[in-house]
């Protein structure tokens, strides 16, 4: 056997060290200031997540716990803001106090398990947990939090779409990573009253895509009676508004008495009440210090943190994954495939976008209407099969009839090769998607002449392209909205600067006028003092002459 055909020595070693283990994704959601960051650090028993306005100032990629290894540092995976800047990465600036932060979603990838470099015995590779922690920032800090629920729901739905597109491919990626969220912890503000409107809306929206566990934070701020009543209020609101949270239900057909007792105990603790802290004592435990003493956050008498850790990483980890896969994802998958398979042939009018990316040329129309009315946009949006009288209702008829074709020709001539290539690629993609959806229509798929293998191939090609096309359109629409909001904000700043400049000019004019008035008044006072001095001298002279005459 020749040397060239001999396999490398480390070939099997690489196969053995291939990534194995459990993939587990958790979402921490809730209003700002409820302790999500502190909980994440306490959950992993390390300080790798910085608090607000501390981003970039701490070593977020360094873990003090040998059992926790940061694979990918924290990154922004999605955000939506009226100001166009993610609040998570922005520094503290009092000048931005009047701006709404929007919502930012971050992701951190970690590896939980034994560290072989620490001299510990090698553990089973299947026990390693590849943990993805998703966190939300900015909820509850906006005048309108509807964009927060929409952004979180859109992110969760996108993860389902990615898995669905991968499953329907003929050739799958062997290194595909599942990013679906298996459990979401929703942090409730410790008001003592119950759920708020934003809590109900958010938990309802995300419960379609993941298991939701409500969490009460700062449990040490309640007495035992107050905490019991707060739990009852929350569960009453959950039943009243039909919020589908994850419940530890007891199966009457289950023969495992230990499991039944465990679920009963966990159901009585819902929602879990926890305490978090950034302070460690001399033994390395997380504690909270008070004037009257020190308490441990893992104390079962005052906090459910220890029980919650066991639920998340022990007893119910696989159940969360199974529920996400077999119930939530399957419902979404069947609904999505039905909508794609039953889609009729899409005409050219529905695939064309009605707006282009904003630019400085249409800045004025963007500020006033939020739409783009430039000649280039009109030429791009105009279709060959669109009658002229349909367009004349929105635009000036005489200008369009006289100059429409000329402007379109000029734009085609002046358009750069890059833009022309981009338009051609976009047109090809739209034609491809249109043809795929046509082939996936019921009339085409139910044809008796079509082989079964061809039907499966058409379905496998349809879903990924359709899902990707929908995501691209959603991203483009989002970018256009952000650009429009930024343009409006820029216009407001321009008007504010112009107003301040006008005020400065008026102030300068007033100061100059006061100076002139001051100089003229000083001259008048000097003249008056001179005249009075002359009168005084005259008086003295008259008195002297009178006195001399008497003598």
Swiss-Prot record:
One of its GO terms (biological process) is cellular bud neck septin ring organization. The modification N-acetylserine is found at residue 2. Signal peptide: none annotated. Residues 135-138 are annotated as: G3 motif. Residues 381-417, 515-551 are annotated as: Disordered. One of its GO terms (cellular component) is microtubule cytoskeleton. The modification Phosphoserine is found at residues 408, 416, 447, 460, 519-520, 522, 525, 545, 548. InterPro entries: G_SEPTIN_dom, P-loop_NTPase, Septin. The modification Phosphothreonine is found at residue 539. Changing residue 426 to R: Abolishes sumoylation in vitro. The modification Phosphotyrosine is found at residue 400. GO terms for molecular function: GTP binding; GTPase activity; molecular adaptor activity; structural constituent of cytoskeleton. Septins are GTPases involved in cytokinesis that assemble early in the cell cycle as a patch at the incipient bud site and form a ring approximately 15 minutes before bud emergence, which transforms into an hour-glass shaped collar of cortical filaments that spans both sides of the mother-bud neck. This collar persists until just before cytokinesis, when it splits into two rings that occupy opposite sides of the neck. The septins at the bud neck serve as a structural scaffold that recruits different components involved in diverse processes at specific stages during the cell cycle. Belongs to the TRAFAC class TrmE-Era-EngA-EngB-Septin-like GTPase superfamily. Septin GTPase family. The C-terminal extension (CTE) that contains a coiled coil is important for the recruitment of BNI5 and subsequent localization at the bud neck of MYO1. This is Seventh homolog of septin 1. It comes from Saccharomyces cerevisiae (strain ATCC 204508 / S288c).
């Amino acid at each position: 056997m020749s040397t060239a055909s001999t396999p490398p020595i480390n070939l099997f070693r690489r196969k053995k060290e291939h990534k194995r283990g459990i993939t587990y994704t958790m979402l921490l959601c809730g209003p700002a200031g409820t302790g999500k960051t502190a909980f994440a650090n306490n959950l992993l028993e390390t300080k790798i997540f910085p608090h607000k306005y501390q981003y970039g100032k701490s070593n977020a990629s360094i873990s003090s716990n040998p059992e926790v290894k940061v694979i990918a540092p924290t990154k922004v995976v999605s955000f939506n803001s009226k100001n166009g800047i993610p609040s998570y990465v922005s520094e503290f600036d009092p000048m931005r106090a009047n701006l709404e932060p929007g919502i930012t979603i971050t992701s951190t990838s970690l590896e939980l398990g034994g560290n072989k470099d620490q001299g510990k015995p090698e553990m089973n590779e299947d026990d390693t947990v590849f943990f993805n922690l998703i966190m939300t920032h900015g909820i509850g800090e906006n005048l309108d939090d509807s964009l927060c629920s929409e952004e979180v729901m859109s992110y969760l739905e996108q993860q389902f779409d990615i898995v669905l597109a991968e499953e329907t491919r003929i050739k799958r990626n062997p290194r595909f990573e599942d990013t679906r969220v298996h459990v979401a912890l929703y942090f409730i503000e410790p008001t003592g009253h119950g759920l708020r409107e934003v809590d109900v809306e958010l938990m309802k929206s995300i419960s379609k895509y993941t298991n939701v566990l409500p969490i009460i934070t700062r449990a040490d701020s309640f007495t035992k009676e107050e905490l019991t009543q707060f739990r009852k209020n929350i569960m009453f609101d959950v039943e009243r508004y039909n919020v589908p949270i994850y419940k530890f239900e007891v199966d009457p057909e289950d023969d495992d008495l230990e499991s039944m007792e465990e679920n009963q105990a966990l159901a009585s603790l819902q929602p879990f009440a926890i305490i978090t802290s950034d302070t460690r004592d001399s033994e390395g435990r997380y504690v909270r210090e008070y004037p009257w003493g020190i308490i441990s956050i893992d104390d079962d008498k005052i906090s459910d943190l220890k029980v919650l850790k066991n639920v998340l990483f022990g007893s119910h980890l696989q159940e969360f994954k199974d529920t996400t896969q077999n119930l939530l994802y399957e419902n979404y998958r069947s609904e999505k495939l039905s909508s794609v398979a039953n889609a009729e042939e899409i005409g050219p009018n529905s695939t064309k976008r009605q707006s282009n990316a904003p630019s400085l040329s249409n800045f004025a129309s963007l500020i006033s209407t939020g739409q783009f009315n430039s000649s280039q946009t009109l030429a791009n949006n105009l279709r060959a099969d669109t009658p002229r009288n349909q367009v004349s209702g929105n635009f000036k008829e005489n200008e369009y009839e006289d100059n429409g074709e000329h402007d379109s020709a000029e734009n085609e001539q002046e358009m750069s090769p890059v833009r022309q290539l981009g338009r051609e690629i976009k047109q090809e993609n739209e034609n491809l998607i249109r043809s795929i959806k046509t082939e996936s229509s019921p009339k085409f798929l139910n044809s008796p002449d079509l082989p079964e293998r061809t039907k499966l191939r058409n379905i496998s090609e349809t879903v990924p392209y359709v899902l990707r096309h929908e995501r691209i359109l959603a991203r483009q629409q989002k970018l256009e909205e952000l650009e429009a909001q930024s343009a409006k904000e820029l216009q407001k700043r321009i008007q504010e600067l112009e107003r301040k400049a006008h005020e400065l000019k008026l102030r300068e004019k007033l100061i100059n006028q006061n100076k002139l008035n001051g100089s003229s008044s000083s001259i008048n006072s000097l003249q008056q003092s001179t005249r009075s001095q002359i009168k005084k001298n005259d008086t003295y002279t008259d008195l002297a002459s009178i006195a001399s005459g008497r003598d």
